[in-house]
Design a protein with these regions (language model features):
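N-terminal secretory signal peptides that target proteins for export/translocation
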Residues: 1-9
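Short amphipathic alpha-helical segments with coiled-coil-like heptad repeat character
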Residues: 3-4, 132, 314-317
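Bacterial N-terminal signal peptides
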Residues: 13-24
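Sec/Tat signal peptide C-region and signal peptidase I cleavage site
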Residues: 25-32
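Well-ordered beta-sheet/strand-loop patches within structured domains
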Residues: 32-50, 54-56, 118, 122-125, ...
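Cationic-aromatic interfacial patches
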Residues: 33-148
């Protein structure tokens, strides 16, 4: 029988053993939780080579879902960026911060949190690509867009984010070109107008000329004011100020800037606000396709307004009207970006096959002396005597000749041909 004095040391031993178990069990639980989290991260990241490499480099530790201040800062910055995705015309359904935060709160187990960790990284990379270089692949939208999208390295993107100020890094992803800034500002302005009265009533008249009066003139005035082409005015007459506003509108939309609101101008003025907003969103996407350094000196050809500009250090030093291919068939001008390789002085113009067989051959069949300023050449490049050719025997498929306009002041290409590497 143990006396109380004898039992005391034994009780101390049992107490120490119990305390040791109490300390060991939580440690084991914590280790198990860490292991479950990292295992879930490893398994989820394995589906994406870039994420697998990224998380392997950090021993499958998280950077979004933890309780640390840095994790919380990254998480908040990402949710703030997602909430502004619509301002950039991006599909907001891809990154709905409310849904994502609800999923985060629902992730109670370490394994669920590990899977959510990788999902946040996947969403971050998706957002980074969308806002940097566009949601769509150009060649899959329009076949004549021969543009290589300047995709960034996904690994470099997520690694750079981890090592940077989260909010600053996310802000720097969008294009910084003046064009993109103007488009975004216009998008926000149009969205504000959508919540008001829009552009107001459409112009009912088929055409309007300076000196006109009436309800259609008032509608035209109000739409020009709302669009930003005319200062506020109460005029009910198509006066000088309205004529100048119409000219500004025409110039901005690739129309003949004569100050007369003809059928084409009225049609353009009457385009609904919602359609204008969609045009802005499309233009912003196109700007994202171009989100790469353009060089201190570059040539910018705007197909939509028929202009070509030389830009030196963000300043236009030369501007000219330019000829753009028709939208039908193979005449459409391609869209591309590349380095100019060389130029040709006093060039010859080699007529495209489509123009030869669709325009010139029918004229030559009616009159062999037609388009006399153009030479007809054989497969060796020798000039053919057109009077010796029976053009009526040929079809568009069988016509064996080429056509060339020699160098001259009247040459279709002018006196200098800048050689872009057309696709």
């Amino acid at each position: 029988m143990l006396t109380p004095v004898a039992r005391a040391p034994l009780l101390r031993v049992f107490t120490l053993i119990a305390l040791a178990f109490a300390l060991v069990l939580p440690a084991k639980d914590a280790l198990a939780q860490v292991t479950a989290f990292r295992q879930a991260v490893a398994e989820s990241a394995a589906r994406d080579d870039v994420l697998a490499e990224f998380y392997r480099g950090r021993d499958f530790d998280g950077m979004w879902t933890g309780a640390t201040g840095s994790d919380r800062t990254r998480r908040n910055a990402l949710m703030a960026a997602f909430s502004e995705a619509g301002d950039h015309g991006l599909p907001t359904s891809r990154y709905d911060p409310d849904t994502i935060m609800a999923q985060l709160r629902a992730a109670q187990t370490p394994a669920d949190q590990g899977r959510m960790e990788v999902e946040l990284s996947r969403l971050f990379l998706q957002y980074a690509r969308d806002i940097q270089t566009g949601v769509l692949v150009p060649s899959q939208v329009v076949s004549h867009v021969e543009r290589e999208v300047p995709y960034r390295s996904r690994l470099a993107t997520i690694t750079g984010f981890e090592q940077s100020s989260p909010a600053a890094f996310l802000r720097a992803l969008a294009p910084t070109s003046p064009e993109y800034t103007r488009l975004m500002r216009e998008k926000l302005r149009l969205e504000r107008l959508m919540g008001q009265n829009g552009y107001g009533p459409t112009v009912s008249a088929g055409s309007l000329a300076p000196g006109a009066t009436g309800a259609s003139v008032v509608s035209l005035r109000n739409r020009l004011i709302t669009m930003g082409y005319m200062d506020r005015s109460a005029t009910q007459t198509y006066d000088v100020s309205m004529q100048a506003a119409v000219q500004r509108f025409q110039q901005a939309h690739g129309l003949v800037a004569d100050g007369v609101a003809g059928a084409s101008t009225i049609s353009e003025v009457n385009i609904p606000l919602g359609n204008r907003l969609q045009q802005i969103i499309v233009a912003m996407e196109r700007e994202r396709w171009l989100n790469r350094p353009r060089g201190a000196r570059h040539i910018w050809v705007n197909l939509t307004d028929f202009t070509a500009r030389i830009v030196d250090n963000d300043r236009v030093t030369f501007e000219t009207r330019t000829v753009i291919g028709a939208t039908q068939g193979d005449r459409q001008s391609p869209e591309f970006s590349d380095v100019m390789e060389f130029m040709v002085i006093n060039p010859s113009w080699y007529v495209p096959r489509s123009i030869i067989v669709n325009e010139y051959l029918p004229s030559l069949q009616r009159n062999s002396g037609a388009v006399s300023h153009i030479e007809i050449t054989d497969s060796s490049g020798r000039v053919v005597n057109r009077s010796a050719v029976n053009f009526s025997q040929y079809t568009a498929r069988t016509f064996p000749f080429s056509m060339r306009q020699p160098p001259s002041r009247g040459n279709a290409l002018g006196q200098v041909k800048f050689m872009f590497p057309n696709p």
